[in-house]
Amino acid sequence: MGDLPGLVRLSIALRIQPNDGPVFYKVDGQRFGQNRTIKLLTGSSYKVEVKIKPSTLQVENISIGGVLVPLELKSKEPDGDRVVYTGTYDTEGVTPTKSGERQPIQITMPFADIGTFETVWQVKFYNYHKRDHCQWGSPFSVIEYECKPNETRSLMWVNKESFL
């Protein structure tokens, strides 16, 4: 096992396919468990891009709400300080969220040697007939996380989450 990095920076980007369209979120205030809701469309595919710093870290998959998304190494950035992985998250068969409700979905990403990244996203899944609702709110390019691995190498503490 290598040295435990002091900080791990990772970003997760979602883009609806086939046109690499933006994903939106809405600020809900304190009405629900979290103040931001990510809007997703059922029966759709999303490109998932994960960037990780330091570039020595390796990951094979991300679980989004229990759906395992295999990640493929895409590149190491030219300056060599980040590594980029991509995969496809499919919402086929996901039940639309009822009106006035939100769904917490668990996000997990197990890293070799340093533990598992875990967080929860508050999501609203819309069906095709309400697809225009998915585009109300603010688009985001990426969700960035600053994490600290714990000493037992079992999980990472999330210090900061930013929607950019």
From Swiss-Prot:
It comes from the Eukaryota. Signal peptide: none annotated. InterPro entries: CNRIP1 (IPR029204). GO terms for cellular component: plasma membrane. One of its GO terms (molecular function) is type 1 cannabinoid receptor binding. PANTHER family: CB1 CANNABINOID RECEPTOR-INTERACTING PROTEIN 1 (PTHR31952:SF1). Belongs to the CNRIP family. Interacts with the cannabinoid receptor CNR1 (via C-terminus). Does not interact with cannabinoid receptor CNR2. Suppresses cannabinoid receptor CNR1-mediated tonic inhibition of voltage-gated calcium channels. This is CB1 cannabinoid receptor-interacting protein 1. It comes from Macaca fascicularis.
